[in-house]
A protein has these predicted regions:
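Accessory nucleic acid-recognition modules appended to NTPase machines
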Residues: 1-128, 132-135
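Residues at the C-termini of beta-strands that transition into short coil/loop
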Residues: 49, 73-75, 121, 144, ...
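Short acidic, glycine/proline-enriched helix-loop-strand junctions
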Residues: 118, 176-202
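A structural signal for isolated positions on well-ordered beta-strands in alpha/beta enzyme cores
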Residues: 118, 139, 166-167
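Conserved acidic residues
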Residues: 129, 138, 163
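An exposure/low-complexity boundary signal
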Residues: 131, 202-203
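Active-site ExK catalytic segment of metal-dependent nucleases
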Residues: 136-148
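Catalytic cores of nucleic-acid endonucleases
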Residues: 145-187
Length: 203
């Protein structure tokens, strides 16, 4: 129970990685292994594993100890954070958790289409929220609550080949062939997730 109640706090850290010490001082990840497994099987939480630098397929976690937990119900995220759900959309500038809220939303939509969750971290602060494998091709997903920059995608491309990247944000649908970047609004992610799952993804 204490694990479940602290998930949004885990995501609100700078690294977002699961940190057992945040729940109980001196505790280890293995102390929560059974709880995480049970909550994942019950679809109460969704587990995303870290990938580093150069990625090989099929996608496999670089380490079982580096992962993140997302809440399986986006409404529960709002409840745990104590922030009105409407503020995540209407007043996002004043809501420091809005970026995490949207990441949690995308994670749930990917899980709904039976994708396994992975995220990428470079040696610096570079990070991409989700990496999807479809038809032996990589599709990095960058989740932005605003316009944001593409620094992480540029660093990712230095180490990995990908079909094209997908930026999920509030912006309108569009495609930049030079950057191989498809931009989609948040409401479109269920359709993209399905196409990736079916292996029918096209621009």
């Amino acid at each position: 129970r204490v694990l479940f109640q602290n998930i949004y706090r885990e995501l609100n850290k700078e690294s977002k990685n699961f940190s057992p010490g945040l729940i109980e001082e001196k505790s280890k990840t293995r102390d929560y292994a059974t709880s995480i497994q049970w909550l994942t099987m019950a679809h109460v939480v969704n587990q995303s594993f870290q990938l580093k630098e150069h990625i090989t397929m099929p996608l496999m976690p670089d380490s079982e100890s580096n992962f993140r937990l997302f809440l399986g119900d986006i409404g529960m995220f709002s409840y745990q954070s104590g922030i009105n759900a409407a503020s995540f959309v209407s007043n996002e500038r004043d809501n420091t958790l809005s970026g995490i809220f949207f990441e949690n939303f995308v994670a749930n939509e990917l899980i709904a289409k039976e994708h396994k969750l992975f995220y990428w971290r470079g040696r610096t602060s570079a990070e991409l929220e989700f990496i999807i494998e479809s038809n032996n091709k990589l599709y990095p997903l960058d989740v932005k609550k605003g316009r944001g920059t593409l620094n992480s995608l540029e660093k990712f491309s230095n180490h990995n080949k990908f079909e094209y990247a997908i930026k999920v944000s509030k912006n309108n649908y569009g495609y930049n062939p030079e950057q191989r970047l498809l931009t989609i609004p948040f409401y479109f992610i269920p359709f993209i997730a399905k196409d990736l799952a079916d292996g029918t993804m096209t621009i």
